[in-house]
Amino acid sequence: MLKASLKSIASYIPEKILSNADLEKMVDTTDEWITRRTGIKERRIASENENTSDLGTKAALKAIKRANLKPEDIDAILVATLSPDYFTMPSTACKIASNLGLVNISAFDISAACSGFIYLLEQAKALVESGLKKNVLIIGAEKTSSIMDYNDRSICILFGDGAGAGVVSLDNENHILDVHTASNGNYGDLLMTQRSQKSNLCQTLSMQMKGNEVFKIAVNTLSNDVVEILAKNNILAQEIDLFIPHQANLRIIKAVQEKLNLSDEKCVITVQKYGNTSAASIPMAMNDAYEEGRLKKGDLILLDAFGGGFTWGSALLKFGGENF
């Protein structure tokens, strides 16, 4: 039976750093409060002339190279983002395909907010294992600064920019074991990007969140989801080599880590230096672990994410990339 594998991981991190000290000068907040409530110390911000597709392209090129492929070997591009270059069309995936010089291939975006990378894995796995595609490029890319209200202290402290990418291809040895995704649209108004009511041209967008409600639901949902996917696959939490969660809030991460009774050595945390990069956070965290030598070929990895929609998901996989 055909098995899909994540054969590479890479990221692109913008140069500009927006620290908590910087935010103290912009809104009524403090470094102490941000750190205590979120665990975030700084986040990266893309330059004005960098679009989401630019961030994604830079991560994609590294991911393709690390998979020992060339751009022309890719036959599908899937992008997860909540901050696309264009409001409706063309898709960010099509822009990245153009940047890579690729035509006549499948390219589309997935809108699943912070859960986007889990959704990408599920779709790429299905495409490869069905035999429809051979090498699927998956990209989580975000320029959240483009939809951020930097006068709203409740949300501007949380988010940053960046991109992560990987290639999913066949590998019957180190493959994606299972992916679970789900949603509940009844909570959609707790975390959303609101269109300005002053214009029907959709020129003004801003992210809005009811943080306390989101926090409670996220902790309960993620804790249950990771327990269920482990049980379904007859895997004990202690068998996991690395737990790489969506990097939204340190308190959420720690709550799920405690539920699984995992040591700090098995939990990858990058929220302190990148903030919440939405669909890019998991591949960015994976890449940090990869380049640090913590993520190695054959390692058993548990991923989880929760985002607007609400959407959520988890994945179990054995990493198929060569060691860094």
Swiss-Prot record:
GO CC entries: cytoplasm
Positions annotated as active site in the UniProt record: C114, H246, N276
Gene Ontology MF annotations: 3-oxoacyl-[acyl-carrier-protein] synthase activity; beta-ketoacyl-acyl-carrier-protein synthase III activity
ATP-binding keyword on record: no
The keyword Cytoplasm is assigned to this record: yes
Pathway participation: Lipid metabolism; fatty acid biosynthesis
EC number: 2.3.1.180
Reaction equation(s) it catalyzes: malonyl-[ACP] + acetyl-CoA + H(+) = 3-oxobutanoyl-[ACP] + CO2 + CoA
Region (ACP-binding): 247-251
Alphabetic keyword roster: Acyltransferase, Cytoplasm, Fatty acid biosynthesis, Fatty acid metabolism, Lipid biosynthesis, Lipid metabolism, Multifunctional enzyme, Transferase
Annotated CDD domains: KAS_III
InterPro entries, per the entry: ACP_syn_III_C (IPR013747), ACP_syn_III_N (IPR013751), FabH (IPR004655), Thiolase-like (IPR016039)
Single GO BP term: fatty acid biosynthetic process
Compartment list: Cytoplasm
Function noted in UniProt: Catalyzes the condensation reaction of fatty acid synthesis by the addition to an acyl acceptor of two carbons from malonyl-ACP. Catalyzes the first condensation reaction which initiates fatty acid synthesis and may therefore play a role in governing the total rate of fatty acid production. Possesses both acetoacetyl-ACP synthase and acetyl transacylase activities. Its substrate specificity determines the biosynthesis of branched-chain and/or straight-chain of fatty acids.
Similarity annotation: Belongs to the thiolase-like superfamily. FabH family.
Subunit and interaction comment: Homodimer.
PANTHER family according to UniProt: 3-OXOACYL-[ACYL-CARRIER-PROTEIN] SYNTHASE 3 (PTHR34069), BETA-KETOACYL-[ACYL-CARRIER-PROTEIN] SYNTHASE III (PTHR34069:SF2)
Comment block on domains: The last Arg residue of the ACP-binding site is essential for the weak association between ACP/AcpP and FabH.
Name of protein: Beta-ketoacyl-[acyl-carrier-protein] synthase III
Organism in which the protein naturally occurs: Campylobacter jejuni subsp. jejuni serotype O:6 (strain 81116 / NCTC 11828)
Lineage: Bacteria, Pseudomonadati, Campylobacterota, Epsilonproteobacteria, Campylobacterales
